[in-house]
Amino acid sequence: YKMKAIKKLPLFVLALLFLVSCQAKPATDDTDSDVSIVEWERSDLYTDADIQAAMDAVMTYFETEFKGCTLTQLCYPGDASADLFTEWAEECEADEAIVLYSSFDTDASGGDGSLEPNTTYDDFQWILVRDNGGTWEVKTYGYG
């Protein structure tokens, strides 16, 4: 039994290191103090300012359109999703697209009533587009 536990220890340590490397930093905007923005690796596609601007657009949209819901986490999935960005840009006839993922909680009313009450939604996608390096616009959102 102890040998099995010892063999599993390196996997446990790796899993722990992975979780620690995905630390969240609190958002700087006081109105969104419940939102944690997951640190992202440096992108070759977007500057940190581009990614932050997209996140700001989602937070603003969420605040006005998702009454009764609390945004708890927002993250950029990394450049590995570049093909997805390209597909969305083409579909939306835009120069660029970016996809962000979020988690949020609904209250007892289910937000505007269209969501399940008292539920946490994870890996909720936000698709944003822009032209000529302009302002990010939330184009669509949801699952998959």
PLM feature spans:
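A generic structural micro-environment signature
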Residues: L9, P77-A80, G134
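Bacterial N-terminal signal peptides that target proteins for export
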Residues: K2-P10
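Flexible low-complexity loop/turn motifs enriched in small/helix-breaking residues
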Residues: Q23-T120
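Sec-dependent N-terminal signal peptides
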Residues: L9-L17
